[in-house]
UniProtKB/Swiss-Prot annotation:
<dbReference type="InterPro" id="IPR009003">
    <property type="entry name" value="Peptidase_S1_PA"/>
</dbReference>
<feature type="domain" description="EGF-like 1; calcium-binding">
    <location>
        <begin position="86"/>
        <end position="122"/>
    </location>
</feature>
<dbReference type="InterPro" id="IPR017857">
    <property type="entry name" value="Coagulation_fac-like_Gla_dom"/>
</dbReference>
<dbReference type="Pfam" id="PF00594">
    <property type="entry name" value="Gla"/>
</dbReference>
<feature type="disulfide bond">
    <location>
        <begin position="401"/>
        <end position="429"/>
    </location>
</feature>
<feature type="propeptide" description="Activation peptide">
    <location>
        <begin position="182"/>
        <end position="209"/>
    </location>
</feature>
<feature type="disulfide bond" description="Interchain (between light and heavy chains)">
    <location>
        <begin position="172"/>
        <end position="328"/>
    </location>
</feature>
<keyword id="KW-0165">Cleavage on pair of basic residues</keyword>
<feature type="disulfide bond">
    <location>
        <begin position="216"/>
        <end position="221"/>
    </location>
</feature>
<dbReference type="InterPro" id="IPR001881">
    <property type="entry name" value="EGF-like_Ca-bd_dom"/>
</dbReference>
<keyword id="KW-0106">Calcium</keyword>
<comment type="function">
    <text>Snake prothrombin activator that attacks the hemostatic system of prey. This protein is functionally similar to blood coagulation factor Xa.</text>
</comment>
<feature type="domain" description="Peptidase S1">
    <location>
        <begin position="210"/>
        <end position="453"/>
    </location>
</feature>
<feature type="active site" description="Charge relay system">
    <location>
        <position position="308"/>
    </location>
</feature>
<keyword id="KW-0245">EGF-like domain</keyword>
<feature type="modified residue" description="4-carboxyglutamate">
    <location>
        <position position="46"/>
    </location>
</feature>
<dbReference type="InterPro" id="IPR000742">
    <property type="entry name" value="EGF-like_dom"/>
</dbReference>
Length: 455
């Protein structure tokens, strides 16, 4: 009987196993549905917390509505959502001519500046020389309804019709040893200073005009020329314009019995290494008003140093090199409308580093901001004529001084350096409320070209 009972129990157990399995193990579809991770709903604490873009849309995938709840601003939401969905379509800067790019989903939109159109603002509707210089690297002029670019001497127009390509190693205005990290300028906080009108001096006395400048390294001011008198002393500066022409101030010419020229030097104390170049002829502008004489203008303004410009013709050509390169001569329009609307120009020379102190043995250079004409005129007790302009600082002790006269005022544009002024005069050196006064080269372009064309 016992064996029969045991057998019945075993059979009953085996018969119940399939039913037990079905109760313990779920079917695959049901199990997968059960194990899927569902999005966690915010707890009551999270619901009352301010929206957080990282929690809502980065840690978890969010909807546009959730993003809007975070930003609480439709425009900001659209900007974020366009990038969030498929990346930033504007990252490659697709808009030409300084157009503004707005990202979209799978696309972008360019907002073009005036006179430009097209998906990427690539089409020029109406070019003007007054808008970004007509996109010209050097000179721009209007021909019918289009702009036409041209280049300074020793450059050729690039195939794009805008750029200028140097035709030689020593083309004008090329600063071959240009400063890289050590810019020929003053710190940003200095350059940002605006010219401020201060009270006029009660004792005006026009004085030949670098105070507190930096050393100009070899080849960094390659257009600088130095005028030497019969005693071997520096008395003025100049600017190389061509192998046989040096531009200077007219008032420099009557200061000595003879004139020699030195180029390519940054330290004139080493007399044994410097080479004096002989002068063939000097051309002084016939309307020049000398410093020892001034006339009373019809408006009763005292005028001196007007037409302060002269050109020296060399007996033998100047040999160009990395350290000796001429400055480029601009057109009048380019100088007035482009160069003189830049923030600043560069002035260099061997003049006195302090008022009534000895001249410097080393070449100095400073960056001087342009001063608007109204401020310039009100700052001086002497008349600022149309042939002059002001540059410098109203409070900082940075200026040209005695011995710098005749030297270059250079303005750079697209890595080419153009002559824009001649150091002429000032009321003292680096005086508070006073600026350096320069001969405005753009007023004399025809005269300069005429003299340079003489045989």
């Amino acid at each position: 009987m016992a064996p029969q009972l045991l057998l019945c129990l075993i059979l009953t157990f085996l018969w119940s196993l399939p039913e037990a399995e079905s109760n313990v193990f779920l079917k695959s579809k049901v199990a997968n549905r059960f194990l899927q991770r569902t999005k966690r709903s915010n707890s009551l604490f999270e619901e009352i917390r301010p929206g957080n873009i990282e929690r809502e849309c980065i840690e978890e995938k969010c909807s546009k509505e959730e993003a809007r709840e975070v930003f609480e601003d439709n425009e900001k939401t659209e900007t974020f959502w366009n990038v969030y969905v498929d990346g930033d379509q504007c990252s490659s800067n697709p808009c030409h001519y300084r157009g503004t790019c707005k990202d979209g989903i799978g696309s972008y939109t360019c907002t073009c500046l005036p006179n430009y159109e097209g998906k990427n603002c690539e089409k020029v509707l109406y070019q003007s020389c007054r808008v970004d210089n007509g996109n010209c690297w050097h000179f721009c002029k209007r021909v019918q309804s289009e702009t036409q670019c041209s280049c300074a001497e020793s450059y050729r127009l690039g195939v794009d019709g805008h750029s200028c390509v140097a035709e030689g190693d020593f083309s004008c205005g090329r600063n071959i040893k240009a400063r890289n990290k050590r810019e020929a300028s003053l710190p940003d906080f200095v350059q940002s200073q605006k010219a401020t009108l201060l009270k006029k001096s009660d004792n005006p006395s026009p004085d030949i005009r670098i105070v507190n400048g930096m050393d100009c390294k070899l080849g960094e001011c390659p257009w600088q020329a130095v005028l030497i008198n019969e005693k071997g002393e520096v008395f003025c500066g100049g600017t190389i314009l061509s192998p046989i022409h040096v531009l200077t101030a007219a008032h420099c010419i009557n200061q000595t019995k003879s004139v020699s020229v030195i180029v390519g030097e940054i330290d004139i104390s080493r007399k044994e290494t410097r080479r004096l170049l002989s002068v063939d002829k000097i051309y002084v502008h016939t309307k020049f008003v000398p410093p020892n004489y001034y006339y009373v203008h019809q408006n009763f303004d005292r005028v001196a140093y007007d037409y302060d410009i002269a050109i020296i013709r060399m007996k033998t050509p100047i040999q160009f090199s990395e350290n000796v390169v001429p400055a480029c001569l601009p057109t009048a329009d380019f100088a007035n409308e482009v160069l003189m609307k830049q923030d600043s120009g560069i002035v260099s020379g061997f003049g006195r580093i302090r008022f009534k102190e000895p001249t410097s043995n080393t070449l100095k250079v400073i960056t001087v901001p342009y001063v608007d004409r109204h401020t310039c005129m009100l700052s001086s007790d002497f008349r600022i004529t149309q042939n002059m302009f002001c540059a410098g600082y109203d409070t900082l002790p940075q200026d040209a001084c005695q011995g710098d006269s005749g030297g270059p005022h250079i303005t750079a544009y697209r890595d080419t350096h153009f002559i824009t002024g001649i150091i002429s005069w000032g009321e003292g050196c680096a005086r508070k409320g006073k600026y350096g006064v320069y001969t405005k080269v753009s007023r004399f372009i025809p005269w300069i070209k005429k003299i340079m064309s003489l045989k």
